[in-house]
Design a protein with these regions (language model features):
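N-terminal accessory targeting/assembly segments
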Residues: 1-103, 114
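Phosphate-binding/switch loop-helix module in NTP-utilizing enzymes
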Residues: 228-263
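N-terminal pre-Walker A segment at the start of P-loop NTPase domains
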Residues: 115-150, 185, 193-198, 202-209, ...
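Conserved NTP phosphate-binding and transfer environment spanning the P-loop NTPase/kinase superfamily
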Residues: 297-300, 306-479
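Conserved P-loop NTPase nucleotide-binding/switch module
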Residues: 249-292, 296-297, 309-337
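Glycine-rich phosphate-binding P-loop
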Residues: 149-181
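Flexible beta-alpha connector loops of hexameric P-loop NTPases
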Residues: 52, 207, 215-238, 270-285
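Carboxylate/His-rich catalytic cores and anion/metal-binding grooves
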Residues: 102-104, 110, 166, 173-204, ...
Length: 479
């Protein structure tokens, strides 16, 4: 249904959230047992700077009721499509609930379409090779509506994804990292389901870090800086990745997803030659290779890692999946046999202990308005969203470009809203980041995003982020 009102600019424009491939909880629509609440934008018809009341009356009382009737009245919906959408969501949730029971961290159904149309499109690639699970990793899932489906189950532990260039390693990992969300019918990844708290990690040169215990990975810095409470305005790749893992542990993630291509090499592994040239006493970094096993056995955190250059990870992997011309092959048995032929020089890592970060979130005092009716009063915090890349809160830029599981600008907008609320209501110089996020999580579960809205109403244009992304946002706020 389209309508164009008389007037200048966006007169008569009626718009609502533009949904993508992922299913997100959005402020655009809320359904309870008693009511449906829809939120949308209307461009008031105007002549210059004056609202055209006659045209506005037509929008509100003639055209808008037609839109509402077509969109929300059950008699006007495609009953079959509506039913299938509900059934699909229930089946997807069923798979996710079965992962832990089956000791899995992810599931990829047979016949899934993993490649995307392009780097700027999340639609499925036409004529791509459908996913088919290797027999040794094939599991079944009993779903309430679809019945029994089969696919590849990725077990808890350390999983290595290997293969030649362009054979589909990163494509599989990308599908798994977005498997924390349900997907719409026709996406191709409807039954690619990952543990809901799984976290994609990468290096972030130049990121801000405050009071993070990175001693699990980095110690004995030449400048004598205490790595149990480490801060920097300009982190290196290895330091940023170490901080990201520690922050992920704090956020409750039990599955880490990493790609060698976007990781700091010196953080991930040190080969035998380098160990001979630079002794352990001269190297402050304990590589991830030496910590991954402890993370699983002592903290219950699984790892899914894409690797293509270093064979050292074969020695710690529980499961090894080779992508061969877009087909997964379980080569775990072959790898175990070869590990004896190519032994790994053992380096004794420092004793494992869980990080103990105690980070207090701080805030700057707002500036004072210098002119206008509010002269002499504190400036209001304003949010300016920069797509999925981040937002400006007041004068502080929050850079979220490396948070790869943010899939929608509306999630970024919601993160800005939540951070603003926290700074104005919860940050007191005493509470830790973890305590603040826990309080926010309770409010989110109780009232939804409306708990953080300015005034009494929540507008359209917000989508609920995961707790992991809330932590990531707060950890990147320089304050």
């Amino acid at each position: 249904y389209t309508f164009r009102a008389k007037g200048s600019g966006k007169s008569g424009l009626i718009s609502v959230s533009h949904c993508g491939q992922e299913v997100l909880s959005r402020s655009a629509c809320e359904i309870t047992d008693k009511e449906i609440t829809a939120r949308f934008f209307i461009g008031f018809p105007a002549n210059g700077r004056t609202i055209n009341a006659t045209e506005l009356e037509k929008i509100l009382f003639d055209f808008l009721p037609v839109c509402i009737e077509k969109a929300f009245f059950y008699k006007n919906t495609d009953h079959r499509n509506l039913e299938q959408a509900i059934f699909l969501a229930e089946d997807q949730d069923s798979i996710r609930s079965q992962l832990t029971k089956k000791n899995l961290v992810a599931f990829v159904a047979d016949h899934s379409v993993l490649p995307r149309e392009s780097g700027i499109s999340s639609r499925p690639l036409k004529d791509s090779v459908p996913f088919m699970s290797p027999q040794s990793l094939r599991v079944s899932m009993e779903l309430p509506h679809e019945g029994t489906i089969y696919g590849m189950g990725i077990p808890a532990g350390i999983t290595l994804i290997v293969g030649g260039g362009y054979h589909g390693k990163s494509t599989l990992l990308n599908a798994l990292e977005l498997g924390v969300y349900n997907h719409i019918a026709g996406d191709g990844r409807e039954y690619v389901i990952t543990d809901a708290n799984a976290l994609k990690l990468r290096s972030e040169d130049g990121r801000f870090i405050r009071n993070v215990d990175i001693s699990l990975f980095i110690n004995d810095l030449p400048n004598k800086k205490d790595t149990r409470c480490f801060s920097t305005e300009d982190a290196s790749g290895s330091t940023s990745q170490a901080a990201g893992i520690v922050e992920g542990i704090e956020a409750g993630s039990k599955v880490f997803l990493l790609d060698e291509d976007t990781s700091a090499t010196n953080f991930m592994v040190r080969d035998t030659f380098m160990q001979e040239v630079i002794s352990r006493e001269k190297e402050p970094i304990t590589p991830f290779l030496e910590r991954a096993r402890d993370l699983y056995e002592k903290a219950g955190i699984s790892t899914i890692l894409v690797a293509g250059s270093s064979g050292a990870f074969f020695h710690i992997a529980d499961t090894v999946i080779q992508m061969d011309s877009y087909h997964p092959v379980d080569i775990s048995t072959k790898v175990r046999a070869l590990c004896g032929k190519y032994p790994l020089t053992e380096q004794k890592a420092p004793a494992f202990s869980m990080p103990q970060s105690h980070r207090i979130l701080s805030k700057k005092l707002p500036g004072i308005r210098s002119h206008g009716r509010g002269a002499g009063k504190p400036e209001r915090l304003k949010i300016k969203v920069h797509g999925k890349d981040g937002f400006l809160l007041g004068h502080e830029n929050v850079d979220l470009r490396c948070i790869e599981q943010i899939v929608d600008t509306e999630q970024t907008a919601a993160l800005g809203l939540i951070l603003k609320y926290a700074l104005e209501n919860l940050v007191d110089g005493q509470r830790t980041v973890s305590e603040i996020v826990q309080l926010l999580s309770k409010e989110l579960q109780k009232k939804g995003l409306a708990a953080f809205a300015d005034g009494s109403s929540l507008p359209c244009g917000y989508a609920v982020p995961r707790i992991q992304e809330i932590y990531s946002c707060f950890n990147r706020y320089r304050g």
